[in-house]
Amino acid sequence: MNRAFCLLARSRRFPRVPSAGAVLSGEAATLPRCAPNVVRMASQNSFRIEYDTFGELKVPTDKYYGAQTVRSTMNFKIGGATERMPIPVIKAFGILKRAAAEVNQEYGLDPKIASAIMKAADEVAEGKLNDHFPLVVWQTGSGTQTNMNVNEVISNRAIEMLGGELGSKKPVHPNDHVNKSQSSNDTFPTAMHIAAALEVHQVLLPGLQKLHDALSAKSKEFAQVIKIGRTHTQDAVPLTLGQEFSGYVQQVQYAMERIKAAMPRIYELAAGGTAVGTGLNTRIGFAEKVAAKVAALTGLPFVTAPNKFEALAAHDALVELSGAMNTTACSLMKIANDIRFLGSGPRSGLGELILPENEPGSSIMPGKVNPTQCEAMTMVAAQVMGNHVAVTVGGSNGHFELNVFKPMMIKNVLHSARLLGDASVSFTENCVVGIQANTERINKLMNESLMLVTALNPHIGYDKAAKIAKTAHKNGSTLKETAIELGYLTAEQFDEWVKPKDMLGPK
């Protein structure tokens, strides 16, 4: 039979039938009109025929997506598999489509169809159908192709559940049923917000909390370790190592607070705005009901956006969230840099901290160990800063009633949230919890510091104190020796007035 089909195809100059892999990579072609039995034979091999408004397309028989998804793979061969739409967006779409089906059933959608849509949407939300979403981020700026990818997958999976034929659009139509009362223009931004909120709550905030708690524990552990401070990378007056770490604790605390402060706008959903924000082709109450369903499904306080025109045309909420993550990246860059510099050495650096040794550090220098967790964290911070630039550009390009940088924006927001959350956990578990204070080195550096002379200001004045420091530095002598030689004070006075433990706060 296969040979007969090949001969028939050759005699009628039919195009070569691509494999499923070729279709996925974009090598799909339209099939000329031919006898039904020929189409059936083709379907029994590696593909089936589906239609969109532009015509017929070959769809791999083992995939639930349809013609519009295949056409997108043909038109947007950009980046390959590594640039696919983030899975959190796909899962968020599953949540949204289930919620919409529930509400549509309340408004009269056939319960049998609604139930099948809900079951298929649940599979999408649970990640069971991830292999059926091949589209890349770099597509239409509204995310229309991905919305249709979701509609097609849910439609065909629902059809299969109901015993129908894949690609027939019966009894479950991707547009008329799965996308009922919806537009890509309001569903994609809704999925963006759902995905961002879930990533923040499941990955980012838990990671930052773990880091915060570990730094807080170290701050308490190092509360009695007095060390020399540094400003402008030069010696300054003393503080405790615990005080130094308390600054890091507060930075991470503020980071979490900034992120949480941005979330109320993320919880506002565009669903119900349809094409331009007017809500055309929806029912009164649809938007509110969908938001309530999404809130129930996720356990997060989602509400309908008070102004759908803003929700479709601007994504300031995502720019705001990205900005909070950008600030977090700045904080983590500073913390990681401080820790790796304080741990520099082991013999030729500052050496005040002893960092965990996790792996060999050099392919040529035996015994070398590097602050790799600090380096990973700083690279993550740099990437997040770059992501924020892209999100900012995207957010500023909402034209009239629609922002058309949606896929790029959510890709970068999710990337930042995931990186910061994961890096915080890695940095905590593989570095922070194992940090030790090198008290011998800390005491040596503090006792040699010329800035202890600052304690003499109230007793002998700034000018004399400065002369003591400069003379001691020039002669290589100690502050005490120099102060006595200059006749500014006695040994007893120096010992009474220059006590690092008395220089740690106001009197």
Curated annotation (Swiss-Prot):
Coiled coil: none annotated. One of its GO terms (biological process) is regulation of arginine metabolic process. It comes from the Eukaryota. Its EC number is 4.2.1.2. The modification N6-succinyllysine is found at K58, K63, K77, K112, K119, K220, K289, K464, K470. Keywords: Acetylation, Chromosome, Cytoplasm, DNA damage, DNA repair, Lyase, Mitochondrion, Nucleus, Phosphoprotein, Transit peptide, Tricarboxylic acid cycle. The modification Phosphothreonine is found at T82, T233. It is an enzyme of class 4 (lyase). The modification Phosphoserine is found at S363. The active site is at H232 (proton donor/acceptor), S362. SUPFAM superfamilies: L-aspartase-like. One of its GO terms (molecular function) is fumarate hydratase activity. The modification N6-acetyllysine is found at K58, K63, K77, K91, K112, K119, K210, K220, K289, K499. One of its GO terms (cellular component) is nucleus. Residues 1-41 form a transit peptide. The record marks E375 as: Important for catalytic activity. Substrate binds at residues 142-144, 173-176, 183-185, 231, 363, 368-370. Pathway: Carbohydrate metabolism; tricarboxylic acid cycle; (S)-malate from fumarate: step 1/1. Catalyzes the reversible stereospecific interconversion of fumarate to L-malate. Experiments in other species have demonstrated that specific isoforms of this protein act in defined pathways and favor one direction over the other. Homotetramer. Interacts with H2AZ1. This is Fumarate hydratase, mitochondrial. It comes from Rattus norvegicus (Rat). The gene is Fh.
